[in-house]
Amino acid sequence: MDRKGFLKSTMIATGSLLLGGAGICRFLNDKEPADGPFPRTIEKIHCGNMKKVLVIMSAGTKLGNTDRLTDAYIKGLVERGHSVTKVYLGSMRIEGCRGCGVCQRLAHQCAVRDGMQDIYPLFAECDTVVMASPLYFWTITSQLKAFIDRLYAISADDKYPQKDTVLL
């Protein structure tokens, strides 16, 4: 890529981040009333009876921008009567999927014994999964990617097809 193409791409990416930041700023503003409207798609996911929400936090540092955004989101959920469990992947040892296929043969039990063994029951109980990740090299963190890959262990019978999912 030549210099002109690089600068053009950088400007487009910066503009996208700034426009996206305007929406994020709304959630971080403490003066915003808690009973204000969520965006329509999120309101659709979180409307109705109390739901169990599992928040998967994949940022490497606590108290960073992603953590602040997630806490604001959780605050809105709790004020609407939902039950929230927050899990920090960065403080757990979670390996990537080995692709061994053991989970597909042995009652969906993953051969890798690590922090995912604590997350699987939480995932089974929840109605909604919120995955929060900063952008590292224009993609989600490796911890979140490993988490998603490891969900393969419980996917064989498609037991959880109706879980709502939000990506922050």
Sequence positions of predicted segments:
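Short, glycine-/small-residue-rich phosphate/pyrophosphate-handling segment
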Residues: 159-168
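Twin-arginine (Tat) signal peptide motif
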Residues: 1-7, 21-22, 30
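N-terminal beta1-alpha1-beta2 submodule of the flavodoxin-like/Rossmannoid cofactor-binding fold
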Residues: 10, 14, 19, 31-154
